[in-house]
């Protein structure tokens, strides 16, 4: 936290019935997974709102029969507005990889492996002393995160640091082994 940071409590936002149902389902899912827990009070309270999930693009004719590209909305996603908390947070400047540099390094190779973490950020626990800062309010109560949520300013850097600590030895050994010996899935299968 920045030295001059003052806690802020946002009031609950009004949600229409459709958005309220989206929030209810997400809250139940997060509670069941143990990612959040109910809290009675906190100095820091953020509010929730819903944003559209974009599914793709379609083309729709307008009044003049011109074809206009339009985004398809497949549903809504609950998000927490951590902007005030993020302003008060001391920034972590851990280097994040640039996608173009990663692609340049990979373009020479014929085999690629992809690891996908289920709820990636949520695999990382939030420090007990900082959990109250992740508190949010919604029509179903006030909750705090046990696990790192999206939209915290330091979440990407923290996640990258953890992944590098976990996989650095594996990546160095695997990359050297697979690219020089067997450019196939054999090393990946042996490790699994």
What are these regions (language model features)?
Residues 1-192:
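Retroelement reverse transcriptase polymerase core
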């Amino acid at each position: 936290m920045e030295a001059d940071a003052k806690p802020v409590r946002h009031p609950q936002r009004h949600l229409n019935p459709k958005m309220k149902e989206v929030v209810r389902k997400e809250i139940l899912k997060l509670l069941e997974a143990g990612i959040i827990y109910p809290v009675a009070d906190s100095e820091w309270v953020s509010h929730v709102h819903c944003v559209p999930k974009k599914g793709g693009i379609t083309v729709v004719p307008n009044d003049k029969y011109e074809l206009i590209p339009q985004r398809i909305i497949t549903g809504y996603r609950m998000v927490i507005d951590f902007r005030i908390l993020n302003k008060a947070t001391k920034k972590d400047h851990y280097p994040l990889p640039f996608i173009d540099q990663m692609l340049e390094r990979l373009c020479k190779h014929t085999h690629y492996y992809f690891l996908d973490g289920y709820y990636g950020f949520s695999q990382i626990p939030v420090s007990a002393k900082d959990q109250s800062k992740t508190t949010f309010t919604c029509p179903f109560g006030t909750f705090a995160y046990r696990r790192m949520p999206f939209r915290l300013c330091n979440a990407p850097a923290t996640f990258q640091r953890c992944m590098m600590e976990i996989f650095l030895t594996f990546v160095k050994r695997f990359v050297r082994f697979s690219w020089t010996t067997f450019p196939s899935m054999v090393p990946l299968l042996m490790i699994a």
